[in-house]
Amino acid sequence: MHMSKSFLLISMGLASISVHAQTLTRDNGAPVGDNQNSITAGENGSVLLQDVHLIQKLQRFARERIPERVVHARGTGAHGEFVVSGDFSDLTLSSPFAQSGKVTPVFVRFSTVIHSKGSPETLRDPRGFATKFYTDQGNWDLVGNNLPVFFIRDSIKFPDMVHSLKPSPVTNLQDPNRFFDFFSSQPSATNMLTWVYTNLGTPASYRTMDGFGVHAYKWINRKGEVNYVKFHWKSQQGVKSLRPAEVTKVQGEDFNHLTNDLYTQINAGNFPKWDLYVKVLSPKALSKLDYNGLDATKVWLDVPEKKVGTMTLNRVPDNFFLETEQSAFAPSNIIPGIEPSEDRLLQGRLFAYADTQLYRLGANLFQLPVNSPKSPVANHNQDGPSNNSTGLGNVDSLDVNYEPSRLVNLTVDKQARAVETPLSGHVQQQAIRNPRDFFQAGVLYRSLSEQDKADLIHNLSGDLNKVNDAEVKAIMVSYFYRADKEYGTRLAKATDVNLKQVTKLASM
């Protein structure tokens, strides 16, 4: 009797499910008759080409992947909001900073830089920290890293640098012989290499790392006055990194630790927060620095910061592919009141990042919800694959796809014009003057605790000891010696490089 009652309950449950279940369909909306068996010519006959459901499933499966990002391939996204902490309209007319308490929705994508999508998140690497602000002036992307500087200062070296850091085209393995061969002729990398080989190169979580805009940008107010700014996200959770032994332990237990931690904490209601700070310099003050303030390999030392707002991440994406994977960030996505500086690396990124997103996602990438502005879009960009918008907004005539027109009145916003900038000099192709490649690496080294110094030497010598070319190894050690004699001496000992050779190279 008990079994009969159970059977009856199960039968009723199945009947209930079948009544309320949604019908499986093909992409054209037609219902599917059988999703377990292909159509065949008899029990043991061939599968028929007319099985359009089977064909469509296989076709769609073969086309699920889009091109992987050439850098920043492995990423984790989250939604949130930015709240400005004051009225900074005296510095910029950009809307996120113009009214105290204003709330701007954001989407953030954290990432590793060099390694591929399936790589462990424990690997040493800078970490991407890209923030998309959905403002009422359009989307603004602040595309930065967890470290304040970069390896190179000119975008013409970017493809070479990435090639050297990526796996070998022969073995498909990342090889210190390759990237130190490249860096041995790039003394500008000394500062960034010091940063990335500290424990900051292996963060304990995305929540416990800072973010930096790296480059100088321009803020312009309504009077047309220009100031240079650098952006800094400060984690309210504090900065925590993994020491060498911890990296090995964590990788063996969970090589997705950064993503797991972020999503677990957000889903538990422990929303991570970052305060946004800016350093501000007038053009005159920038010109008086004893190093090039537009050099992406430098931080602005001894320039005070001011807090301008707080970001809170409070929602995990509903679908990884639709949001995180298809999110497209580019420094060229700017709004009135913010302009790029003359930083040579930034100038190249303005083109390269936008172009790689067009390659990955197509010309209509801004129609994807995660990239779509919250503000109205009205222009005459048209057609292309997967277009589902006229792009014209609430205009009177869809027949007019040009401007100017007497039939449709599209206006421009004069405050969005490029700020007038004086130019002088001659067209040239030369390195910057006064590069000062080594001194900030020394400042960083001397600021570290003894434990952090020891970990830096351990981390850096571990990769340098894999280099087969003795000259490359000696040159690299000489760069760090020029940054700080103690730094170079300890590194020479850890790598069995002759200190006399190092000092000779350092004096050249």
Swiss-Prot record:
Record's catalysed reaction(s): 2 H2O2 = O2 + 2 H2O
Top enzyme category: oxidoreductase
Protein task: Decomposes hydrogen peroxide into water and oxygen; serves to protect cells from the toxic effects of hydrogen peroxide.
Residue ranges with Polar residues bias: 373-392
Top-level lineage group: Bacteria
UniProt keyword Oxidoreductase present: yes
Residues at which heme binds: Y353
Active site per UniProt: H72, N145
Biological process (GO), any one: hydrogen peroxide catabolic process
Lineage, opening ranks: Bacteria, Pseudomonadati, Pseudomonadota, Gammaproteobacteria, Vibrionales
Source organism of this protein record: Vibrio vulnificus (strain CMCP6)
Gene3D superfamilies: Catalase core domain
Protein name: Catalase
